[in-house]
Amino acid sequence: MTLLAPRWLTLSALLALGATTSIGCAPPTDEEAGEEGSSTDDITQIDHTKVKRQSIGNCWIYASASWVEALNKRSTGVEANVSESYWTYWHWFEQLANGRSMTEISTGGSYGTIAGLIDRYGLMLEADFVAAESEAEMSNRQSAALAAINESLKTGALKDPAVRRNRAKVRAELDKAWGLDRTVVGRLDAVFGTGVTKTLDRSYVRNRPNNSIIRARDFDAAIYDFTTNTVKKVKLQDALGTGSYWSRSGPLAFQEVNYPSSAAARRKFQIAVQKSLHASVPVIISWKVDFNALSQSSQFSKEELDRRGPGRQGGHMTVMDDYQVKLSDGRVLKAGEPATADLLTRALDTRATVEFFRVKNSWGAIRPDRWSDAAKPGYHDLLMSYLNGPIKECVERDGHSDPTNCPGSVTPWWDAVLPAGLGNDIGF
């Protein structure tokens, strides 16, 4: 399979899934254990951090943060709360300072976008960026800041192109919109300069920036080396690799790979994902949401969608956690239940059929307005009949999909970010 360019999750294509009144990453309106004495293992053992809830359309940042936190937790045993707001701040800065935002900020992005942001600006913990939200499930600061910046673009300081060309003034507007206190602003100034004359990839190659700003090369992570079949404690930079938005390189670098079209290639792709999950390595997945496919049991079902017809649509990014599979003899290995090593091996047979993948989402843990009976709070089951599609694709009007105008069709599963060593049979 040819490796295609990563899919860009645009503002108009994304659904703001975290809140009930915003638009963004798809808009929010509001079997058994083995024989006695045999060793068992969960189908997956990814030690995820707590579920969060996005308030704007930056699901790709939340998915990436979950991925980073899981890699770090496996290495340290500690649950870090990485600041999604910090990366959102710099995403907006680059749009404004580079002339890409004239009337409204785009909240959309991709894995390639976040990798580049981490290269240049590293990461911060939420307690060090927006301390008031260090324990919050949802960031109200993000939605307030978005409204403030968009208003500034329309009627305020950022309406003036000369201001947008002044990087120090752009940062000042962002600092004000985000309500950053003087200590945090001082940290950013000390590391990057008031006009962002320094970035981590250029000015801090040898020295740590300190001031609570962490380079990827200093942030602990643990991955699974599929060439040696061992867990390795590394740094986040090893998992990210180096390179541009379009391509990341490095012996341990994860790669964004498009979901193939043929049944045989798709099964190889699924097996690569299964192997990653067996090794407790989180996998980011990009997929198309149609809310009419969401059942009260928190499943995305083609059957449900066919019954109800098309609804609101958009792009989404989440992190995989588990899966359910029917073996070639008809036995079902259920998500969340233990299985012997032999059964896990049989789950990788090309004749085995994955029934669904379970993903950690960024829509909050308890959402009676969206679902009432989740197998795992904050997680969703993406049935393969839905992911394989095809489903109707509706035309967008004013940033919203029109369920009455759906002339085309699409495969909902777009791509996945896979660890090094798993893609030889599927394209990289």
Indicate where each model-derived feature is located:
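Bacterial N-terminal signal peptides that target proteins for export
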Residues: 1-12
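Mixed-charge, low-complexity intrinsically disordered regions
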Residues: 231-260, 304-308
